[in-house]
Design a protein with these regions (language model features):
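N-terminal, membrane-interfacial amphipathic/helix-forming hydrophobic leader that caps
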Residues: 1-71, 208-226
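Juxtamembrane helix-loop-helix connectors linking adjacent transmembrane helices
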Residues: 62-124, 137, 142-143, 217-219
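Membrane-embedded alpha-helical segments of multi-pass membrane proteins
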Residues: 12, 16, 41-47, 114-119, ...
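Hydrophobic alpha-helical transmembrane segments
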Residues: 8-12, 76-84, 113-117, 147-155, ...
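Short juxtamembrane and helix-loop transition motifs at transmembrane-helix boundaries
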Residues: 1, 110-114, 128-138, 153-161
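Membrane-interface helix/loop boundary segments of multi-pass membrane proteins
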Residues: 130-152, 185-189
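Functionally important transmembrane alpha-helices
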Residues: 169-226
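Small-polar-interrupted transmembrane alpha-helices in polytopic inner-membrane proteins
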Residues: 86-90, 146-161, 177
């Protein structure tokens, strides 16, 4: 496949698909009278499954890459230390903007919060790791020169969150893409990149920023914003 075709495929998958899914609720309301509930995660899982099956059909699926765990201790220290600093900054920013949101989710809906803390890393982060790190690196990264490759990967990861319909989701996830993709590139460890992704995601939900990332019901937004 030539470079132009590979880039077009990248745009269709990482930008065309989220854009189409963005309008699913609107079209469902218009033509069916009701919007589907809790459909984002199933859609993500279907796309991820399609990607994995596509690679398997081409004979290019290496299970060792999908379940790679090894990373030097210094990389774990870097990821955890950086998270501690950025988590403190995110807490301070939310405290300045919406102090009433701080820790509201676990306080007001502890059972739902616990479910999110467990399910988000196991389901959502794992699927996104396959789609936005493993698959992007093996199929599309080489289609972009130099630093454009990292920007393309971060932009793709960010644009997936257009489904949440707010700029904060796009901003946070673009920054996340600039963190998680280099971690995977440096180490080749899906585990470390996914742990880093899960740390930030679970922290955002817990501290109060999760109001910008809920889907399927109003429970999280109500728990955070009151």
């Amino acid at each position: 496949m030539n470079l132009r075709a590979r880039r077009l495929e990248f745009v269709l998958l990482y930008f065309g698909t989220p854009l189409a899914l963005r309008y699913v609720p609107d079209l469902a309301r218009r033509f069916l009278g009701a919007a589907p509930r809790a459909w984002v995660i199933p859609a993500l899982l279907l796309v991820t499954l399609g990607v994995v099956l596509s690679e398997a059909a081409r004979g290019r699926l290496r299970a060792a890459e999908l379940f790679s765990c090894r990373a030097p201790a210094r990389e774990w220290a870097l990821v955890l230390g950086r998270f501690a600093v950025l988590a403190a900054l995110l807490w301070a920013l939310l405290r300045a903007m919406h102090p009433d949101w701080l820790w509201a989710f676990p306080r007001r809906a502890p059972a739902f919060w616990l479910l999110v803390m467990v399910a988000y890393p196991l389901v959502s982060v794992s699927a996104q790791g396959v789609l936005y790190r493993w698959y992007f690196e093996r199929r599309y990264a080489a289609a972009f020169p130099g630093r454009w490759s990292l920007l393309a990967g971060a932009a793709a990861f960010s644009f997936a969150h257009i489904l949440f319909r707010n700029p904060w989701a796009l901003l946070f996830t673009f920054a996340g893409g600039l963190l998680f993709l280099p971690t995977y590139r440096r180490t080749g460890s899906m585990l470390l990149a996914n742990v880093e992704h899960a740390l930030y995601g679970d922290f955002l939900f817990t501290v109060g920023w999760g109001a910008f990332f809920y889907e399927g019901s109003q429970a999280m937004a109500a728990a955070v914003a009151g």
